[in-house]
C-alpha cells in the first residue's frame, strides 16, 4: 500500500498542517479525526487496515487531516463565538488549502468523499452540507450534529448556527444546495448501544429534515450492542464503502 506522510503551510491557520495519504488511486476520501485525534489516528486505530481491500484495488485513497478542535469547539476557555470563528478558519483551510493540495497530489478534480467517526462524523457531514460541490459522498459514523453539544445554548449567534447541521438544514431551501444533496450518496450511521445516546437526538432530527425535504439518504441504525467505539467503526466503514458507487 502506498503511504505518504505530508505537510503544508496553512496561511489561514498560520501553522504547518500535517496529513497522511493511504492509497495510490481512486476517489480521495477526506477523513476528519475524532475529538482530540490527529492525522495519524485513523491508521493507529486500524481503520486503514479495515478498508485495505478498497485501497489496494485503487477504488479509494484516504487523506487523513489534522484537527484544530482543541482550539475551536473543544476549547472551553474561549467564548462560543470565538470557538465558531476558529472553526471557520479551519473550514477555509480545508476548502482553500487542503483540497487544492489533494487535487495537486492526485490529479483528481471531481468531487470527493468525506468521512469521520464521532466528532469526525460531525465535521464530515457539516463539510458536505456546506460544500456539496466539493464533496458528493459522505459516511458519517456516530456523530453529534447539534452545536449545542459543544457550546451550550447559542442564542442567535449566526457563526454557530451555520455550523449546527441539525438546525440549519431545516432552513436550507436554496435549490442549488438541495439539488446537489439529492444527487449525492449520504450515509449517516449510529449504534444504539453504549455511549451513543448523545448523538441520537440530532440523528433523528436530521433524518426528519432529510425526509421532509425529499433528500435521499441512508440513516442506518445498528443494534443495541453497537457501541460508540472503534471496534464497530472498523466494521461499519468497509461495509458502507461496499454499498457505494466507487
Where in the sequence are the language-model features?
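Non-catalytic cap/lid and distal C-terminal segments of serine-dependent acyl enzymes
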Residues: 1-246
Amino acid at each position: 500500500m502506498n503511504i505518504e506522510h505530508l505537510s503544508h503551510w496553512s496561511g489561514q491557520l498560520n501553522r504547518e498542517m500535517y496529513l497522511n495519504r493511504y492509497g495510490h488511486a481512486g476517489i480521495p476520501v477526506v477523513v476528519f479525526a475524532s475529538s482530540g485525534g490527529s492525522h495519524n489516528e485513523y491508521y493507529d486505530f486500524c481503520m486503514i487496515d479495515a478498508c485495505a481491500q478498497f485501497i489496494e484495488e485503487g477504488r479509494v485513497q484516504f487523506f487523513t487531516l489534522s484537527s484544530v478542535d482543541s482550539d475551536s469547539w473543544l476549547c472551553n476557555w474561549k467564548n462560543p463565538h470565538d470557538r465558531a470563528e476558529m472553526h471557520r478558519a479551519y473550514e477555509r483551510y480545508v476548502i482553500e488549502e487542503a483540497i487544492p493540495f489533494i487535487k495537486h497530489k492526485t490529479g483528481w478534480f471531481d468531487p470527493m468523499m468525506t468521512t469521520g467517526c464521532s466528532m469526525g462524523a460531525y465535521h464530515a457531514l457539516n463539510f458536505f452540507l456546506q460544500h456539496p460541490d466539493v464533496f458528493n459522498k459522505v459516511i458519517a459514523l456516530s456523530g453529534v450534529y447539534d452545536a449545542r453539544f459543544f457550546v451550550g445554548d447559542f442564542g442567535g449567534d449566526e457563526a454557530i448556527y451555520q455550523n449546527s447541521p441539525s438546525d440549519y438544514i431545516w432552513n436550507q431551501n436554496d435549490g442549488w444546495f438541495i439539488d446537489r444533496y439529492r444527487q449525492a450518496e449520504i450515509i449517516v450511521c449510529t449504534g444504539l448501544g453504549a455511549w451513543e445516546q448523545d448523538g441520537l437526538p440530532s440523528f433523528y432530527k436530521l433524518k426528519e429534515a432529510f425526509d421532509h425535504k425529499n433528500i435521499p439518504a441512508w440513516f442506518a441504525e445498528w443494534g443495541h450492542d453497537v457501541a460508540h467505539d472503534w471496534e464497530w467503526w472498523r466494521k461499519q466503514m468497509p461495509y458502507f464503502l461496499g454499498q457505494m458507487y466507487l
